[in-house]
Design a protein with these regions (language model features):
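N-terminal low-complexity, acidic/polar interaction/targeting segments
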Residues: 1-213
């Protein structure tokens, strides 16, 4: 049976994925009220992408994990964490912030044997990415992921457009997200390796001309 509920809504120009941390600077009065109400009721709020005037209907619940900083004027810096996904059925006004009647949803299928194979392929490719960029300095970070969580992590590092990130958020299987991430990451790593080769060739030529001159 599909679970439903009513949650506060926080439209943002960002796509939040499950398990993804999201720091926020809260300064508008309506969102100060939202955070205050969520803390008082120990409740999550929903992050929805708003892009080019469009408010998307599928989003991710955010749980307030920590209050990082409080300011004298009431502003807050908070750290949130993406939880389960939801679909808005009805937007409601009446409070300082929007609320939504939502249904919570997750992937339609269980993890298939193909997911583990994709997971291993992407994991190997990610090591190349880490060496090329230095962005992932702690190898245990990746080791702790499940294929489900890893499929969302890939969307974060692949530098997709907002609309593409939204499409990935709305995918209903880890296998589909991993396959998409593998294709994009392979292209990215290949391009980075080519850039390195070109830089080396140009550097060698520069050194050669300097010697000749």
């Amino acid at each position: 049976m599909t679970e439903t509920g009513t949650i506060p809504l926080f439209p943002l120009n960002v796509v939040l994925f499950p398990h993804q941390p999201l720091p926020l600077h809260i300064f508008e009065p309506r969102y100060k009220a939202l955070v205050r109400d969520c803390l008082a009721a120990d409740k999550d709020f929903g992050v929805l992408l708003v892009h080019q005037g469009q408010l998307f209907q599928n989003g991710t619940c955010a749980r307030i994990e920590n209050i990082l900083e409080k300011f004298d004027d009431g502003r807050l810096k908070i750290l949130t964490l993406g939880k389960r996904r939801f679909r808005v059925k009805k937007v409601m006004e009446g409070k300082p912030y929007l609320e939504g009647e939502v249904e919570f949803w997750d992937d339609e299928t269980d993890l298939s044997p193909g997911v583990e194979a994709l997971f291993r392929q992407v994991h190997t490719l990610l090591k190349d990415y880490a060496q090329l960029t230095g962005k992932i300095t702690d190898p245990t970070l990746v080791e702790n992921f499940t294929p489900y969580g890893f499929s969302f992590f890939l969307a974060e590092i692949n530098m997709y457009s907002l609309t593409r990130q939204q499409e990935i958020l709305e995918m209903t299987s880890a296998e589909e997200r991993l396959a998409c991430g593998l294709k994009s990451l392979a292209h990215l790593v290949s391009r980075m390796k080519l850039d390195q080769k070109l830089q080396k060739i140009l550097g060698d030529r520069h050194s050669f001309f300097n010697i000749c001159n």
